[in-house]
Structure formats: structure tokens, C-alpha cells
Swiss-Prot record:
Modified residues (Phosphoserine): S204
InterPro entries from the UniProt entry: Ion_channel_UNC-93 (IPR010291), MFS_trans_sf (IPR036259), UNC-93-like_regulator (IPR051617)
Protein name, as recorded: UNC93-like protein MFSD11
Family from the record: Belongs to the unc-93 family.
Record-linked PANTHER family: ET TRANSLATION PRODUCT-RELATED (PTHR23294), UNC93-LIKE PROTEIN MFSD11 (PTHR23294:SF0)
Location relative to the cell: Membrane
Membrane topology qualifier: Multi-pass membrane protein
Major site of localization recorded for this protein: membrane
Gene: MFSD11
Species, as recorded: Macaca fascicularis
Positions bearing carbohydrate: N40
Gene3D superfamilies per UniProt: MFS general substrate transporter like domains
Length: 449
């Protein structure tokens, strides 16, 4: 297998492993609040929104140290260990208790920080300026396929149900736990690129032994250097501007992954299909994500206009979706009680419009995330772990804040917050992309996704 083929193989395995893990986790997140509402009529008392706020809050704080962890342990083992914690969190829903539910939320927050920093590092070392766009698109399309498979099962399994029984819950979460473990094991199929694991012609085995002996001493240096680089990158102009865009992706991630499905499941006017529509919504979010990732990956070699048109498409698609959601859903849908809401929207609530908005949310999200992955890999190819850690730090802290306020804010206020951040995030991304293009024009090669 040629070096380039091996790198492409690694990207595909990375995407497939994440597809399995997040088939389980994103399906879990999509139905968590609905499942917990059913559980709250028993001895269990908890909130899916609060759990997600804990996860993303711990996630954001943990990103400060994850570059050091990945530098010492390596991306492959980091992702495997993180996958075990993801599986543990999902397994908690088989027989949940408040203490285990919230404790697992803390652990998965730490694991998520390690996982995504390692993913960014793995993506970057298996790419160059020519392939980063293509590889970002391939990874994103495979990752977001997870939304399709898990939610397809939810749609058929929960069709016609207004309450989630104990048997239904256990069946779903046992299956999701197994799926997550399969993805975790797949990380062991990722190979080191030839440039990292093949000795040069002039390098003897004695030289290699010397490197092994020195590696323990170098680990501490690597950890400290990675920690310092994270703080230095935080205050660069480009990273500060991209942080506004990243903040928006955190807010809209919370909305489409947790809040929107809950809104659909709370609208009593949708009738007996309201719970199964949560699964259908997730499927169409996934279709939008897959379409976007695949399309931008295929166009990466031919797009001469840079990343900005894709981001512009993303914000326009999202603004259309937000407006339709504002018209189609009652304002109290995100915070409705277990019995749901009978409130009226500005128009007659339509299942078809709700599902269309799911597709638009997924498509717009893929526009932003593929371009952020691409530009980070391009600008910070030498400091990928710290750069992706900062990206996930900002994204996750905003997601945590959004999950927290989702317990209290009516729908139209949540939409307004996203519109404001989306507008300024788009402008800030444009600024960084223009500067990147100017830098390339002065002598470096350039490929946009």
C-alpha cells in the first residue's frame, strides 16, 4: 500500500470508527431528554439538558490539558480509551440512577476532550495542504452517517408511542452500547503514516534504541510544549476570530442535537407520531450532514473560490431553517412538561416543515464544520493538537451554556441568540479566510475544501 493510500485508509477507518461510536452517542443525546421525561414519572429525577451541560462544561475545561495527554499517549490510544468512556455513558441508560447518570456525564466530558483533540491530530498527520479538504469532507460524511442509522431504528421502534417503556429503553441502549464498543475497537486498525514509522536508510537500529530510551524524558517536554502552544494560539488574531465562528457551531450543535428533537416530541398536535418523529428528524439531520460533507469533499479539488462561499451557504440555510422553526413551533416546546404542549405556533404546526428544517439544520452544520476543520488543518498543520483543542474548548463551552439555558428560554429567544452569533461568526470566518488566501498568494500552495 502506497503512503498516500495508507493515509486515505486511516481517514476512512477514523470516519467509520466515529460513525459507529456516534451512531450510539448522538442517538442517545437526541432521545435522552424524552427518555428522562418518561423516567421522571418514576423514582428517577434528572434532566437530559443538565447532563449535556455538565458534559460540555467538563469537555471545555478538559481541552486545556488534552494536547498534553495526546502528546504523551498518542492519538490512537487516546481515542480508544475515550471510546470506552462513551460506551460507559450510554450503558448508564440501561438502568439509570441520578448519581450514575451525572457521574458518567463528568467522565464523558473528559473523554470527549481527549477524543476530539486526538481526532484533529490524526486527521492532520494523515493530510497535507492538498488533501486536507478532501479528508475533512470524507471524515465528516462518515461521522454524520451516524445520525441516519441510529435514528432510523428509533423511528420504527417508537412509532405510535407516547411514553417510553422500561423494556423499550433497555433494548435501545443495550444495542447502542454494543455499537459504541465496535467503533472503539476499530481505532486499532489505524496505522502510523510511513513517514512516522519507517526508518530512513541511514538510520540504524542502535539509533532507534537510543530514541526509545530518550522517549520517556521527551514525554514531559512534549506535554509542557503542547500546553504552552495552546495558550499561545489562544491569543492569536486568527484563532480569536475563528472562535466566534466556533462559538456559533457550539450553540447550533446544542440546538439540533438536543433541543430540536425535544421540541418535536413535545408537540401534541403531531399526534401519536410525535415520539417517532424524533427519530425521523435525526435521520434528516444526518442526510443534510452527509450530503454536505460528501459534496464539499468531492468539490475540494475544483473549488477556486475558497471556503467562504460554503460558509455563506451554511448561514443562509440556517437562517431559513430558524425562520421556519419560529413559525412552525410553539414557543414553549423546549421546556414543555412530560405531557407535552398544546400551544399554537404562528402557523399550523406541520410535520413536513419540521422535517425539512431538520435537513436544513444538518446541511448548514456541515457547511460550517467542514470548513472549520479544513482551515484549522491548513493554518495549524504544525500545531494541530493545540489548535483542535482550542476549537473544541470554545465549541463545547458554548454548547454547555446553550444546554443550560435550554432549560429556561423559550424557543424564539434561543433562535435569536443563534442568529446573532451566526451573523458575526460568518463575518469573522470570512476575515480569516481572506487573510489565508492572501498568505497563499504570497508563495504557499492553497487548497480549499
Amino acid at each position: 500500500m502506497s503512503p498516500e493510500s495508507k493515509k486515505l485508509f486511516n481517514i476512512i477507518i477514523l470516519g467509520v470508527a466515529f460513525m459507529f461510536m456516534f451512531t450510539a452517542f448522538q442517538t442517545c443525546g437526541n432521545v435522552a431528554q424524552t427518555v428522562i421525561r418518561s423516567l421522571n414519572s418514576t423514582d428517577f429525577h434528572g434532566s437530559g439538558y443538565t447532563s449535556m451541560a455538565i458534559i460540555y462544561g467538563v469537555f471545555s475545561a478538559s481541552n486545556l490539558i488534552t494536547p498534553s495527554v495526546v502528546a504523551i499517549v498518542g492519538p490512537q490510544l487516546s481515542m480508544f480509551a475515550s471510546g470506552l468512556f462513551y460506551s460507559m455513558y450510554i450503558a448508564v441508560f440501561i438502568q439509570p440512577f441520578p448519581w450514575s447518570f451525572y457521574t458518567a456525564s463528568v467522565f464523558i466530558g473528559i473523554a470527549a476532550a481527549v477524543l476530539w483533540t486526538a481526532q484533529g491530530n490524526c486527521l492532520t498527520i494523515n493530510s497535507d495542504e492538498h488533501t486536507i479538504g478532501r479528508n475533512s469532507g470524507i471524515f465528516w460524511a462518515l461521522l454524520q452517517s451516524s445520525l441516519f442509522f441510529g435514528n432510523l431504528y428509533i423511528y420504527f421502534a417508537w412509532q405510535g408511542k407516547t411514553q417510553i417503556s422500561e423494556s423499550d429503553r433497555r433494548t435501545v441502549f443495550i444495542a447502542l452500547t454494543v455499537i459504541s464498543l465496535v467503533g472503539t475497537v476499530l481505532f486499532f486498525l489505524i496505522r502510523k503514516p510511513d513517514s512516522e514509522n519507517v526508518l530512513g536508510e541511514d538510520e540504524s537500529s542502535d539509533d532507534q534504541d537510543m530514541e526509545v530510551n530518550e522517549s520517556a524524558q521527551n514525554n514531559l517536554t512534549k506535554a509542557v510544549d503542547a500546553f504552552k502552544k495552546s495558550f499561545k494560539l489562544c491569543v492569536t488574531k486568527e484563532m480569536l476570530l475563528l472562535s466566534i465562528t466556533t462559538a456559533y457551531t457550539g450553540l447550533e450543535l446544542t440546538f439540533f442535537s438536543g433541543v430540536y428533537g425535544t421540541c418535536i416530541g413535545a408537540i401534541n398536535k403531531f399526534g401519536a407520531e410525535e415520539k417517532s418523529l424524533i427519530g425521523l428528524s435525526g435521520i434528516f439531520i444526518g442526510i443534510g450532514e452527509i450530503l454536505g460533507g460528501s459534496l464539499f469533499g468531492l468539490l475540494s479539488k475544483n473549488n477556486r473560490f475558497g471556503r467562504n462561499p460554503v460558509v455563506l451557504l451554511g448561514i443562509l440555510v440556517h437562517f431559513i431553517a430558524f425562520y421556519l422553526i419560529f413559525l412552525n413551533m410553539p414557543g414553549d416546546a423546549p421546556i414543555a412538561p412530560v405531557k407535552g404542549t398544546d400551544s399554537s405556533a404562528y402557523i399550523k404546526s406541520s410535520k413536513e416543515v419540521a422535517i425539512l428544517c431538520s435537513f436544513l439544520l444538518g446541511l448548514g452544520d456541515s457547511c460550517f464544520n467542514t470548513q472549520l476543520l479544513s482551515i484549522l488543518g491548513f493554518l495549524y498543520s504544525e500545531d494541530s493538537a493545540p489548535a483542535f483543542a482550542i476549537f473544541k474548548f470554545v465549541q463545547s463551552i458554548c454548547a454547555a451554556v446553550a444546554f443550560f439555558y435550554s432549560n429556561y428560554l423559550l424557543l424564539h429567544w434561543q433562535l435569536l441568540v443563534m442568529v446573532i452569533f451566526g451573523f458575526f461568526g460568518t463575518i469573522s470566518f470570512f476575515t480569516v479566510e481572506w487573510e489565508a488566501a492572501a498568505f497563499v498568494a504570497r508563495g504557499s500552495d492553497y487548497r480549499s475544501i
